[in-house]
């Protein structure tokens, strides 16, 4: 058995706590809702970046490429100073939502290079300029620019020109679950020798200053310096740990600095601080030369080893540290028994790193598809690394947050009825997969569902645990709603959680060997969520749904999360289609569970009939439902003053109806007599519903009979696909656009008493301020919906087979089966990350460094979305996150090249796993 597989098994059985330590330290805690105690809910202003170095956080911690335990009690991270910066670099910098010309925006260059699922080995890279970091210029230039202008990035300031920067590599390797080895390599890429102050640090999250008791609020812990054993960290629930620091390249020991993780009240508020030694002491010591800022007694709750380095041109230095359990902790490791730091950081240290790197390579060699090319494997490995590095401790207890803390100033009046007050039950204190480590350091429920598809390949147990977690009673609302994200927990995201549960169930074992208990647990709780949707979002009981913005931010004519300026209401093609998709997914889950428990046959019948009712409403209610027969497309409909007005915007809203597609196999139905009887009765007695669209048609193949449940009939499917596969409309060189390119020359306008509302093709960053302006669904390519389209097309092909071919691209004369179309879209999506002519990856735009510089060209960012014409990445740059779905797409392509999907004709899905096996 591979060592990493063994570690995963030991952790799953709770025999050894291999996942106790990981990259769970946030990249940004400032500017978040959970740190906001303002009266107006102005999170960015209440806790800005300028406060972060001086102010203790209430709900978490942040740092630079750091680690922490799963409860974020003890943290380790880097701090850097080049002798020129105005502040000590302790965390990544970026613009707030009000500073960026497209909303919040990271202004750093760091990359996640490797990680195993247990974090037994991790590697990341931070590129640190040798010139003064241009904090002020980045803010001022971004404020000067409009939403129509490109963003001003760190590289645009010239700080990487001539190679005048440091590549700072951080590696972690576990000798044992509580024995973490740290290797830091700083390489000078410039032509001259340059100074670098490097401060690896250890600190406790402040849980003692709030006046609360209970399991989350242990007594104040301590760090203290010992001559032989480095820093000793004592914590009431974590136990005792040692941090050992090796000598610098000149043979000298680092200078240890100590302070308290307490707010500098004097600097921020003109009030006395709880301690003379405060959070920003190391900044004051280095940048401002205030020696008295650090505690000479060598005690505190925050410590750092200060290395003052001079690195020659083209040279590199290596530093070694080790965080290990000590006496007072369980099962002290070899490092704790070593006579001194040098022994613990010597040959055995090097051997552990060599072993863990070898094991990581072995794990991915066995886990990733063998047919991946070297270029594809580079992308896949970094996508996996980004996904694993994006696990973060997330703490947020709404009741305590609304009340305020006993030892802090009283909460502002009205806070008890402010943001998220309906979620008084929410009690989050978990490691959760984040959309992006800096721009979105808070969970988003529908993002997380997509994360779990590639996660199921890497760590099936974690994938299942995350999906169950969001259905537990301390997350899910008592009424059945899932929490959206901290900015507005009651916002409505697309109902994809059931799909993720079903896909993860199928991906994590062969038929007969899957986790049926997981499927039952999630199905039972999803029934509550489905009922919430039906009761809250089907306003008139007609099976046509509203839902708000549904994660697609600015895609609509109106801000769909607010009351309409016209009055009336909106029946949304996407909301209704999402519910049809929800029905088919729950039907598939119920049929699986019914094969072994007949009680589920009744609920399977319920979801079958509910799907048919929704599909009928979408296609036929009032004549043609939300279908526009003139255009051959699905549109939102505005209902006002007795009129039904289609909003003729060709967008992803009209493609989402394709997602709802499920094939019923006769051999499955034969094992379910109760469901089959009800199905026969329905077909024979409800001809008004069963006979008017093609989704009830039968198809044969190899003697098998199948039935297709889908929203569009075959004829309507073909009409929609003509738009979707037209390069003048949706089909881009790198996937399916979120808005048709036809709206570039023909914007859609709708006039209301408050003015004209206009939707135009906008292929890159948003040129409007809707939803903060940092997201855009009016043209760019987005991975989650593209992934679902690819899956749906493979299911349609499973039913129609070679009897249905379409032109791809439209007008080209080249005909493909729907499986061929799915593979074409998948190939276009993965091409975003693969080197093309001249070594350029489309996702990196025109930046020549990423094409030809040996220190940049193999590095990949996984952006939030991609320019609808040229594929340039936009939005968040570390969205692994759902853009890690590229890992599943690459694997699917590799399997097809290897011929593994040719035997049965069953859909493999983009990740290469057979659909209903």
Model segments located where?
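Acidic, mature catalytic/reactive cores of soluble proteins
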Residues: 1-58, 64, 74, 81-917
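Active-site-proximal polar cores
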Residues: 68
